[in-house]
């Protein structure tokens, strides 16, 4: 949201530099990779590419510190009173958010057409260092088409475990789903399917327990 709110040109070229590579080693974006801001946003949302996310922050006016400040201001505007952001990627354990705050963020992010589209993009092939590289959406439910998902993001650090947040439409009702600290790699996705199935079986017709949208 901060990237899009900034109105910075989406076709501006950004370069993955040595600092990005040194800070985030698990990435297929090699040093020297050239991306547009739009491509970096797509890879960050779809494939959880941390170098892409960090590069977006580094190329924000004022750099990463200003970007993080903007993230925290945005959170405050949204009423996320139990959240704090420490870096653009979410990989630092100092990044914290409550489940309810994450629903607030989901509701706000859903208003951005590009975030909806990019976060639910199944896969993408890009030429990186003169070689085609295929990037997959980190949410297997998006790739399989098992659910009607309007927005989603996966995440993982040791302190938080496997996490998943998403907006999905079940029985023509938009639901905000938050799964934190899932035990296994696939359990968060299986839990989402279980919630969908349970909701569809509710007697007397489906109705939201708590309407958040």
Where are each of the predicted segments found?
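Penicillin-recognizing serine hydrolase domain
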Residues: 63-213
């Amino acid at each position: 949201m901060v990237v899009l709110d900034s109105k910075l040109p989406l076709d501006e070229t950004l370069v993955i530099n040595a600092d990005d590579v040194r800070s985030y080693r698990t990435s297929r974006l090699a040093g020297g990779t050239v991306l547009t801001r739009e491509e970096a946003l797509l890879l960050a949302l779809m494939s959880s590419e941390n170098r892409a996310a960090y590069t977006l922050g580094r190329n924000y006016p004022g750099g990463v510190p200003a970007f993080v400040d903007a993230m925290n201001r945005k959170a405050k505007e949204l009423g996320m009173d139990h959240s704090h952001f420490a870096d653009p990627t979410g990989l630092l354990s100092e990044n914290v958010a409550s489940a309810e705050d994450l629903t607030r963020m989901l509701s706000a992010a859903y208003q951005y057409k590009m975030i909806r589209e990019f976060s639910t993009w199944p896969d993408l092939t890009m030429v990186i260092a003169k070689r085609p590289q295929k990037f997959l959406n980190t949410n297997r439910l998006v790739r399989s088409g098992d659910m009607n998902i309007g927005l989603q993001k996966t995440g993982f650090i040791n302190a938080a475990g496997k996490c998943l947040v998403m907006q999905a439409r079940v029985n023509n009702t938009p639901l905000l789903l938050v799964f934190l600290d899932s035990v296994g790699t696939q359990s968060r996705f299986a839990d989402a399917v279980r919630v969908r199935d349970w909701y569809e079986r509710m007697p007397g017709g489906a109705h939201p327990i708590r309407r958040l949208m």
